Amino acid sequence: MLPDQALPIYNLLEKLLKETHKSINDCYKNENLYKHQLAKIYCQQAQICTPNGSTKLSKNSIGLYENAANLGSEEANIKLGKIEFKSGNYVKALEYFKNLCKRSF
């Protein structure tokens, strides 16, 4: 194959690679958006499960906050960190607070 004949093929390959890269980036952004929205929903459900004016969270609320924290929610990590700190579980509290630095979205 002559170099002049290969040029259109290379141009087509370049175009396909760019489109594939853009598609992968779009999927990554959509996945992060989905995780962020799901974490928000978990936090909202946890607030609903907490009796009005109560400072103590139910096991159900804590479970929902843990789900949100696993998705990278700042609100959930702060809430769980405060709970563990007040309970005297300083190592666990520190883990939740460290997760704030590893934000995924």
From Swiss-Prot:
Domain of life assignment: Bacteria
InterPro entries in alphabetical order: TPR-like_helical_dom_sf
Name of this chain's protein: Uncharacterized protein RC0040
Native organism: Rickettsia conorii (strain ATCC VR-613 / Malish 7)
